[in-house]
Amino acid sequence: MPTMTKRPARTRLLPADRRAQLVACAVACFADHGIARATQAQVAERAGVSVSAVYSYFRTRADLVTAVLDAVAAAIVAMVEEADVPAAPLRSALSTLAHHTADMAVEQPDTVRVWLDWSTGVRADVWPRYLLLQGQLQAHVRAILAREAPASPALNSAARLFVGGAHTLALMRFEQVSAAELALFIDQMVGGTLAALRPDSSGMPLPVP
């Protein structure tokens, strides 16, 4: 008589834990399929639950998108905050932040892939939320720059320059460039930010110490 194989019982999670699991699966789905195309059914399949279970936490696709983008934004902001070393010299602080940004593409690739996709949604409903995140990141970098150049009229531009370079860092990680090439780009990125921060009276950048 053939032996019956029992299926393992499905783990029953607390609502908060189940929601966190679904959001994590949704981030992975959004990374694979794109913000505009990922569905509740794909999330359910990845999580191993019924589609109705996903709908019980996210009534509409818009609710799911909001949860995913909130999670992505929170992860990126947390990375930036953790990378900040207030006592470090400015060049060192920026270099550390750049390295952490590049490493995030390796450690949390799905989060970074969603972030890159999010940055292309210029005409979509998600665009204002993306600009809000960019504003948060620029404000954090601006605060770092202001520690040594509080009166610089170029604080905003220098912060934009640095945050913009973060996209290139992520793409270079996904391209799997060499460590030497990545380090060279980070050095140039930091140097360019500092040069933009300290123009002389003629408008030309001053040498960066």
Predicted segments, located by residue:
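Short, charged helix-capping/linker segments at alpha-helix termini
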Residues: 34-37, 147-153
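Short secondary-structure transition hinges
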Residues: 103-139, 171, 175
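Amphipathic alpha-helical packing segments from all-alpha helical-bundle domains
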Residues: 74-80, 124-149, 156-160, 184-187, ...
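N-terminal intrinsically disordered/low-complexity leader segments
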Residues: 1-17, 28, 200-209
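Helix-turn-helix
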Residues: 21, 25, 29-63, 67
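Hydrophobic alpha-helical segments that form the core
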Residues: 152-175, 183-195, 209
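Short, basic, alpha-helical segments at the C-terminal edge of helix-turn-helix-like DNA-binding modules
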Residues: 40, 70-76
